[in-house]
Amino acid sequence: GWHDAGDYDLRVESQAGEAYILAMACENFGAYWDETSIDFEKRIVEIHQPDGKNDLLQQVENGALTVVAGWKALGRLYRGILCPTVRQYAHLGDASAHTDHVSGTADDRWVFTEDNPGRELQVAAWLAGISRVLKGHNDTLAADCLEIARELFKITRCDNNWILTTKVHAAVELYLATKEAGYRDFVLQQQDFICKNIRQTGWFIGRFDQAVGNVRFSKAIRKALPELQAMYQEYSSKTPYGVPHDRGNRSSGSWEPQHLGYNYCYLHAAYPDLFTPDYIFNAVQYLLGMHPGRNQAAFVTGVGAETMKAAYGVNRADWSY
């Protein structure tokens, strides 16, 4: 799994969610990059040493392994894997130095669980998507991801709109992974809900719409999409950058442009007549510092209008977070 920058927690949504995003980059764009050697068994990573394997798929593996291992150990998803003391949290240096690696001593990390159906179904959606791209790269892990996604979809209760939204997303990803009629029929049965909640469902429903080709369903979705189109137009008008930098989440000025731009890519791909590519370019240009204003620092290390000297990393001693 991955740590946040300057943070020593591993959250299940960070692990599965990031692995899913990278998986979708591979699936939709054929993204390939090989500049790193990664040996999971020996726990060795060497940068600038290609190993003949797609780095993106190896990163997908990295995220999936921690989620699958947690499931196999606990029989459920973990919520977070955290260092137990404030002193460890404020640690300067590599995370591996938190512990003496001897089981049972007080420096071991704690594993937290929770009863959160929405998050569990969200992870089910992500694992189903991950399973598709891991086929042929790590077939055992791909099968584990799909099996866990199926089980979570089957056993997780659904009693509010957010949970149902995540269940529909899980069904979409499971259908795309398996082509099984049960998942297809579940999504089709939720047509009215999907249309009423198009702001939340629109970004992921297009791939299903195209894959299934149900005329009645397609007409209903297209009728609902102008509401989502208007939402993005409203967001674009809120700042000189063409993207909102903040919708209440003040912990990072890059999350909203990334999240909304990523979702918009799927809307443009599925319905290009309704969603022009402009918003995608606005999001990318904002992240690269190519926008009005004095501060044109890029959010991505090494590229953009003005690149920051400090690399983005986890070690607080490097001031890299």
How should each PLM-predicted stretch be described?
Residues 55-82:
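Carboxylate/His-rich catalytic cores and anion/metal-binding grooves
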Residues 145-178, 186, 190-193, 198:
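Beta-propeller domains
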Residues 42-59, 141:
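Acidic, glycine-anchored loop motifs typical of Ca2+
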Residues 33-42, 76-80, 141-144:
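Short, glycine/acidic-rich hinge or "gate" loops at secondary-structure transitions
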Residues 30-33, 78-82, 136, 298-302:
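Short, solvent-exposed loop/turn and secondary-structure capping segments
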Residues 22-29, 64, 71, 127, ...:
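Sec/Tat-exported extracytoplasmic proteins
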Residues 1-16, 25, 50, 83-133, ...:
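Aromatic (Trp/Tyr) and acidic
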Residues 19-26, 39, 44:
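General structural concept
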